[in-house]
Amino acid sequence: LIQEQKERSREDRKRMGDVGWASEDLGLDKSLKTEFCGYTQLEAEGNVLALVSEGESTDAVRAGSKVTVVLDKTPFYAEMGGQVPDYGTMSHGDCEIEITNVQKNGDGRIYLHSGVVKSGVVSRGDTLVCEVDKERRQAICRSHTATHLLQEALRQVLGSHVEQAGSYTDADHVRFDFTHFAAMTPEEIAKVESIVNNIILEGLEVRTDEMPIEEAKKLGAMALFGEKYGDIVRVVRAGDVSIEFCGGTHLDNTAKAGMFKIVSEASVAAGVRRIEALTGRKFLELFEERQKTLNDTAAALKTTPTDLVQRADQVVEEIRGLTRNVDSLNSKIAEMKLSELLNAAEDVNGVSVIAAKLDDTPEVMRSIGDILKERNANGVAVLATVTGESKIQLLCVAGKDAVKAGAHAGKIIKEVAKLCGGGGGGRPDSASAGGKKPEKLDEALQAVCSVVAGIVK
């Protein structure tokens, strides 16, 4: 996951032309520090401590230019712990900056806000009004709180061995990696979903507190394996259900998550599984999309959504019946043509050879081939038909005695297919091929006897 986060950061820098990802590279004053107030405020004023544009520190940046802004105070959450950064705006008089990425520098003291100056001029020393995109922040909070509930539900259903192995929290989208030794069953997934949604519907208070790490451990707070923590830690609690060390942003009540839906579960490494899930508006979008699919399918089958499963079972049974009828008709057609084909056979080195172009479907051709292979043990048959797309389908079968005599359907069909612009192959007793030149088919079939003669000696 760490590598994936690095890749995302690189993509962000490439997309935005962001600069200032390490204060040392920018020549920024290492004594600079940004105070984060975004846990309790989505709007705040911050003084511009430094500006970077085109890879260099500068005193002012004009409209149309990309910029990285360092403030003394910010409500913008910087990407960390698997949670994506806040977006939003900064403004001062007629100056407006659109912020689309926020990162911390190497030691985490400086917040680097990257974006584009949309209008006016931003200068070092300006006081900017910072406004976080509230709707997006709320969607991210829904996902992050749901992630905590998901981990608790997984431990209840799968066992206490489940531990977080990584996560990515975006707007109404959850990606959660966890330790487990097997794929989850549909029943387990449904049970986990049910537990999470029941906790959401309970409307439990979500509290965040800072406390000494030893006190947090006594409370049973779960920590991320391998993570280093300071003496004072931030603890997030959802009622009495979940308690974890966490520096991310959260809802104040589980009910605000809306609903929770797992959309996939898969392996990402030995002993590590990954769940992708949706909350809030993305859950609603998925629900509406699937409801439309359900309604459209029901309409196509001339039934109601309530009776769709029963109608689908009926259609499947009807198709099975029609398939049986088609198979029966194909067999009858094959039987009718069999004697005509056998009468046209030629002897080649003791093997009965048939080469014929059929005006039938590929299915009928296969039925004829199966019968010929079974009844004409000492025979080889090359059959061909041209489909509606003017493409040739070829089939070669060889009876068991013909195979013993040296016949090989795969080798025969390969040579014949070459003559009509195609290729193919297969087993000694059965092989298929295709061709792209229908105008060459008659010539190819006329060559079958000589091809067999070259193989059966």
Which residues does each predicted region cover?
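A glycine- and charged-residue-rich anion-binding loop/surface
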Residues: 1-457
